[in-house]
Amino acid sequence: MAWKEIDMKKIINKPENYTDDMLHGIYQAHPDMVKYVENDLRCYCTAKKKEGKVAIITGGGTGHLPLFLGYVGENMLDGCGVGSVFQSPSAEQIYNISKEVESGAGILFLYGNYTGDIMNFDMASEMLEMDDIQTRSIVGADDVLSNKNPDARRGVAGIFFMYKCAGAKAAQMGTLDEVLAAAQKAKDNTRTVGFALTPCIIPELGHSNFTLGDNEMAFGMGIHGEPGVWNGPVKTSRELAEESMKEILGDMPVASGEEVCVLINGLGATSQEELYILTGDVEDILKEKGIKVYRTFVGEYATSMEMAGASISICKVADEEMKQWIDMPVHTPFYTQV
């Protein structure tokens, strides 16, 4: 039996001000790290511009913190266009951010594989080319179950590894094409599977955006509530780990002796305890297959507001340079790695 739609209970003011009120709070809390330009809160930029470095700009809708804006900071990203909940930022916002953070080495646009984002980033790129500012673009597309065609897959939590590698290469003062290649290397070696236990509530909608039965979960669901590959009874952590790893390793084979990074991501309302139970099961499966774990990341990296659930991302460590990128210290308002 399906749940009734869940009514909204959130700590907000007006639903229509949700995104701007959130941004106001971030700027108040972290004035030394981030700022906005063109009198537009949604033009989110680093406050510590580094001259001569390739600028990396991302963008996407509100509702996924720390994705997307949460990774703007030292040794990661330089700017983020912020859209309303689950909506794309505008081309004008992306353009204005680009003009602020660009410092002569060009710009890499790195964002999720969603139609509205692609359209607006492409428009911004055309505007920048008219200003003789060089750009390159790459989209995250790590969600294995969203499409059999790799080029049509959604970008979800695995984009973290693209941010990490591209940001590190840019911090090493790599060229625009070298930074793009670093992002591409992470993209080629990253796959994600997610699953939801409860829906989320979009503020302006006022209730849940889909329903699940009392003992039902959705396997393969997207971070905007896109349908998964199946809905069914809630499974154990070990069962979810096994099914997820079957899908990931079936799409991206990893041989015994190879090294991977593991990212266990909470979707917004899943306890740390549950995430670590899942982590243990995933790593046990990898060890049984002779696959070495180079580094593990556990926490909230790409959420869907208050959705309960998790995702598993595996990033195959291709070479020693990739290890250097993954290990590079970073510092943002939402994520620090020492």
Predicted regions and their residues:
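Short, acidic/small-residue loops that bind anionic groups at enzyme active sites
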Residues: 80-85, 129-153, 289-293
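Mixed-charge interfacial surface used for oligomerization/domain docking
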Residues: 172-277
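N-terminal amphipathic/basic leader segments beginning at the initiator methionine
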Residues: 2-56, 319-338
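Short glycine-rich or small-residue beta-strand-to-loop segments that form or flank ligand, phosphate
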Residues: 9, 54-61, 77-80, 106-115, ...
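Glycine-rich oxoanion-binding loops at beta->alpha junctions
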Residues: 64, 73-103
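C-terminal non-catalytic interaction/assembly regions of soluble proteins
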Residues: 247-338
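Short alpha-helices
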Residues: 138-178, 182-189
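Short Gly/Thr/Asp-enriched flexible loops that form oxyanion-binding sites at enzyme active sites
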Residues: 118-132, 274-280
